[in-house]
Swiss-Prot record:
<dbReference type="GO" id="GO:0016491">
    <property type="term" value="F:oxidoreductase activity"/>
</dbReference>
<feature type="domain" description="Thioredoxin">
    <location>
        <begin position="2"/>
        <end position="145"/>
    </location>
</feature>
<feature type="disulfide bond" description="Redox-active">
    <location>
        <begin position="41"/>
        <end position="44"/>
    </location>
</feature>
<comment type="function">
    <text>Participates in various redox reactions through the reversible oxidation of its active center dithiol to a disulfide and catalyzes dithiol-disulfide exchange reactions.</text>
</comment>
<keyword id="KW-0560">Oxidoreductase</keyword>
<protein>
    <recommendedName>
        <fullName>Thiol-disulfide oxidoreductase YkuV</fullName>
        <ecNumber>1.8.-.-</ecNumber>
    </recommendedName>
</protein>
<dbReference type="InterPro" id="IPR050553">
    <property type="entry name" value="Thioredoxin_ResA/DsbE_sf"/>
</dbReference>
<keyword id="KW-0963">Cytoplasm</keyword>
<dbReference type="InterPro" id="IPR013766">
    <property type="entry name" value="Thioredoxin_domain"/>
</dbReference>
<dbReference type="InterPro" id="IPR000866">
    <property type="entry name" value="AhpC/TSA"/>
</dbReference>
<dbReference type="InterPro" id="IPR036249">
    <property type="entry name" value="Thioredoxin-like_sf"/>
</dbReference>
<dbReference type="Pfam" id="PF00578">
    <property type="entry name" value="AhpC-TSA"/>
</dbReference>
<keyword id="KW-0249">Electron transport</keyword>
<keyword id="KW-0813">Transport</keyword>
<keyword id="KW-0676">Redox-active center</keyword>
<dbReference type="GO" id="GO:0016209">
    <property type="term" value="F:antioxidant activity"/>
</dbReference>
<dbReference type="GO" id="GO:0005737">
    <property type="term" value="C:cytoplasm"/>
</dbReference>
């Protein structure tokens, strides 16, 4: 995805965990952080406490949605996804992308990957990999400042 592109529709899921959200619900009032992760991704698990901290710190100002992107057959087990999500305190809605519908819509190749959309649903920041949480927070704060 390129910057300023609109958020894709959140469709094609195998399932939703922790509730379901639509693109329409995410656009209008608050910016949105969509993060891709996988149960086989060590870096994702390492970064999750920081993502959760974000979610809790900005809960009134920011929508947070997780996308589980399988990287192997083992990653397709719904029980394991649910179990890993619980172990890592992923309480935000999780789009289970077993068929890579959202992965393809986002043109995403990485986990972890982070997409920050402003309140109008335009992509404002993208980053992938395990580092750079400070950069992510900076970008989120910038988009939040525009909302006030």
């Amino acid at each position: 995805m390129k910057l300023r592109q609109p958020m894709p529709e959140l469709t094609g899921e195998k399932a939703w965990l922790n509730g379901e959200v639509t693109r329409e619900q995410l656009i209008g009032e608050k910016p949105t952080l969509i993060h891709f992760w996988s149960i086989s991704c060590h870096l994702c698990k390492e970064a999750m406490p920081q993502v959760n901290e974000f979610r809790d710190k900005y809960q009134d100002q920011l929508n947070v949605v997780a996308v589980h992107m399988p990287r192997s057959e083992d990653d397709l087990d719904p029980g394991k996804i649910k179990e890993t999500a619980a172990e890592h305190d992923i309480t935000q809605p999780i789009f289970v992308d077993s068929d890579h519908a959202l992965t393809d819509a986002f043109e995403n190749e990485y986990v972890p990957a982070y997409y920050v959309f402003d309140k109008t649903g335009q992509l404002r920041h993208f980053q992938a990999g395990g580092s750079g949480m400070k950069m992510l927070e900076k970008r989120v704060n910038r988009v939040l400042a525009e909302t006030e």
